[in-house]
Every structure is written in structure tokens, then in C-alpha cells.
Amino acid sequence: MSESFAELFEESLKSLDMQPGAIITGIVVDIDGDWVTVHAGLKSEGVIPVEQFYNEQGELTIKVGDEVHVALDAVEDGFGETKLSREKAKRAESWIVLEAAFAADEVVKGVINGKVKGGFTVDVNGIRAFLPGSLVDVRPVRDTTHLEGKELEFKVIKLDQKRNNVVVSRRSVLEAENSAEREALLESLQEGQQVKGIVKNLTDYGAFVDLGGVDGLLHITDMAWKRIKHPSEIVNVGDEIDVKVLKFDRERNRVSLGLKQLGEDPWVAIKARYPEGTRVMARVTNLTDYGCFAELEEGVEGLVHVSEMDWTNKNIHPSKVVQVGDEVEVQVLDIDEERRRISLGIKQCKSNPWEDFSSQFNKGDRISGTIKSITDFGIFIGLDGGIDGLVHLSDISWNEVGEEAVRRFKKGDELETVILSVDPERERISLGIKQLEDDPFSNYASLHEKGSIVRGTVKEVDAKGAVISLGDDIEGILKASEISRDRVEDARNVLKEGEEVEAKIISIDRKSRVISLSVKSKDVDDEKDAMKELRKQEVESAGPTTIGDLIRAQMENQG
């Protein structure tokens, strides 16, 4: 208690008479077990429970002969005894101190001891005061743990003893303390300057640092060169730290601070330390759905994309390959210094099954595998090393197409194929099933050239023409215009399914695998051949005389 408060209190005692509720002065005459006997100049001595004389540390604060202030509860309680209370006296003293502090705009000391709606409760010399949440500090504070249980200074901003209502402010004390210091600091603060500060508060995005009357924001991205999830990984409330002033807005009194800028930037000359293709050990620091981050050195992290984790499984979740804290070998794939990004690969440090396959097998080799899946565009075959090869729809059968071609296959079937091509860079292996056998179309075309006369059976017929089965799954096309020299409006009026026809091959398109037939052309050729044969027979049937006569007559005419 200050000297003025003590004088005020003593003066108040002089003006009191010995009525119940009065604060009087007594002498401790005995301390016996659970009771303290006090002589206050009344008819009888009063006894007070000894626990009213213990401090917060559990220590007895009086001894025999000490002068104490006590409250008079009753001059005689019916048994001829005087009832006194040290607690009520202490409470009265506290109210006098609060009233004096309120009137003089001076500070009082108290302890934050609880949370209530809208703020906190503060014990000020035994009086329960209310501290609004907005008046805890000069800026909003989410976490007050570091303030609770400590003796702090407050100003009384509202006081009503009758209603037992006391409101205090810590913010007013801080603003008063910081005013002069703040002005001096604002005058001297410069960008690039290194200063000391105390961490006041932590948020998800950074920490507020008290520089001495001025708060600065240390953003989470300026705490360390490495990736961190929360500021508490680097600093704690109450820490005294050195920081660098990155930006100072004098008009708005806003200060941006940096901690990592006090050390050397690890990204300087990063490409010289980690050339593309370098293999190093790295520590996994974080997992995401799209990959994992790995630390090459303090402050330098790279991303291993999920596609660079495994040669054969492109959609594997990173947690199936690595865990946070794992030490893994990685290869540097690319460094973007400007964007501070490093692309890393794990699979590049392992044997490439595509290159292994390419070195082991050649185009034309036969290889067996198990059908893993059947899609609209082909069949995927599982091969050794965990890789797949594709039999494209067009390489399943020489004659069947679409669903017809894949109908006889199912998942899990063991299948023999021919290697058509291997592209390790694009990670593609093309396989073929139909290439296990000779191409029946090519064989047929080599035996039946253009102009050949062939026999077949009508397989299908519509108005425009017919499909002719030539045997060995070879088909020919007979258009309506090629059925007869006479005009055919509807091929169905001339041909029937199952009917045998004889026709001439008028074209073979090896690329589209189409053989065009013509009965009309065959009939024309047959007629020409018949005419030649007829003329030949007529010449042979005429005798030598007849021939000589003809020659002679011709010579005569010429003459």
C-alpha cells in the first residue's frame, strides 16, 4: 500500500466509533492452535480463526505483539465475547485502496484467476474484479495462458462498492507505459534494422512481437527458410528474440518482421550444390494427396510428386510409399530458383522396369502374361516387373473387330502375345495377338491377284450389294452395279444368302483390307473370250483355197 493510501486508511479509523462493522486496531496477545486472540480495547478480547492470518503461500503473517486491523462483528455476542474478523477488515482495506486508486488514476495489482463471459475475473487484494476481454492488451489476445496466475498491474475504470462491482483494465496500463517508449522507437525504427523483441501472442499465421511499445508481425513465412505448420514450432510466447525489420509503414504504424532473414538464404547457389540428376538422402517432412515434401538440408525442401514415386503405380497414395520422418534417397529432377521449387523423384533411384524390359526383349519376341483388364480400346496384359503391355483392339484378330474381337477373352486369362514395339521413355509396350499367325488376307491376296476369278457364297445381301464369303474368313464386296450388265436397282432381287457366285477380283485394297468383286466384269470377259474362240474356230474351219481366195481378192482390190 502506498504512503497516501496508508494515511487515508489510518484517518478513516479515527473517524469510526465502536459500532458493529467498524474497522478497529487491535494487538495480538495470543496464538493458540486454531485461534488468534486480539485485544482491541473493548470489554473483552476477541478471537479470530488463525486461517484468516495466512497468506497465499500458507505462511502465518503475524506474531504475538503485532498490531492488526480487524472488523468489529459484535461487541458482545450474548456470551459476553467480542467477535472480530480479519477478513472483513482486509476487504474494507481493499475497497479503500481501490477507491483511492480510482480517484487518483493510479494502478493496482491483481491476479487473473478465472474466465467469465466477455472477459476474466481478477483478484485485487481479495476483491473480485472484472477484466473485459478487449482490455487485456493493446491488441486482441486469443491465448491468455501466459498472463493467468501472475501478478499484473491494472487501472480501475469503474467502481461501485454498494453493488460490489469493480471493472479494471490492463490495456490502460500498457498504453501509458508504452506511450513514451513507443514514440522513441517509432523515431528510430528503420527497415533493415535488427532489433530485439518479446513474443506476445501466437496466431495461425504468425507471431506478434513487442519491440518496446510497438508491436510487429512476424509472419509464419518469415520465421524459417524451411516449411513450418505453426509458429509454435519456432517461437513461444514470452521468448526474447532478435528480428529484422522488413517493412515499416510509418503512416499506419505497421511493422513487418523477419527471423529467417538474419541467417543466410539456403537457396543461394542451390543449383551448384544440387545439379540436376544428383542423388541425395532427404527426410520426409509432409505428406499430401499429390505427393510428399522432403528436406534436403535446413530450409531447403523439394516435392516428390506422386507420379515420381513408383514406376508402375501412378495413382498410389504417398503414405503407401513413405512416412513423415523417413530418410529416403531422391534424385533432383528440376530446380526453379525463381519460384523456389525443387522437383524430386524417388522412382529414379530404383531400377526402371521399362528399360529392363527393353534390354531383355526385342520386337517380334513372343511373351506370355495375364489379362489384367479389358477396355474399349484393347486388352492390358500384366508382364514381369509389374508393368503392363497393351494389345490394341486392332491387333487382336485379323478378321474380327470391336466386341466380336474381345468376346473370347476374360480377365485372368493367360495369354501369349508378340511384342510389336517397346518405348521405355513413354512407358509403353505394344503387343499383338493376331501376329501369332500369318495374315490370311495377305495370304489370300498373294494367291489371288487382281483379275483372278474366284468362287464364293453370299453371306449378307442388301439393296446396295452383297458380302461374299471367299473362305478362310476372307470376304469380298460385290456392289449392285457389279452384279450384272443390266441395271440392278436392288441386289436382293438378284442374289440370295447362301447362293454361290463366281466373280472377278477387280481391286484389292491391302490397307483397308477390302476385296472388290464383279460378276459383270467376269461376264464381259467371258463373252470376249467366247468371241475370240468363235473367230478362231471360223478361221480354222475355212480351207486353204478359201483363204487364198480371200487374199487374192484383197490384193486385187488394192491394185
From Swiss-Prot:
The keyword RNA-binding applies. SMART domains: S1 (SM00316). Keywords: Repeat, Ribonucleoprotein, Ribosomal protein, RNA-binding. Residues 21-87, 105-171, 192-260, 277-347, 364-434, 451-520 form the S1 motif domain. The keyword Zinc-finger does not apply. Binds mRNA; thus facilitating recognition of the initiation point. It is needed to translate mRNA with a short Shine-Dalgarno (SD) purine-rich sequence. Belongs to the bacterial ribosomal protein bS1 family. This is Small ribosomal subunit protein bS1. It comes from Pseudomonas aeruginosa (strain ATCC 15692 / DSM 22644 / CIP 104116 / JCM 14847 / LMG 12228 / 1C / PRS 101 / PAO1). The lineage of its organism: Bacteria, Pseudomonadati, Pseudomonadota, Gammaproteobacteria, Pseudomonadales. The gene is rpsA.
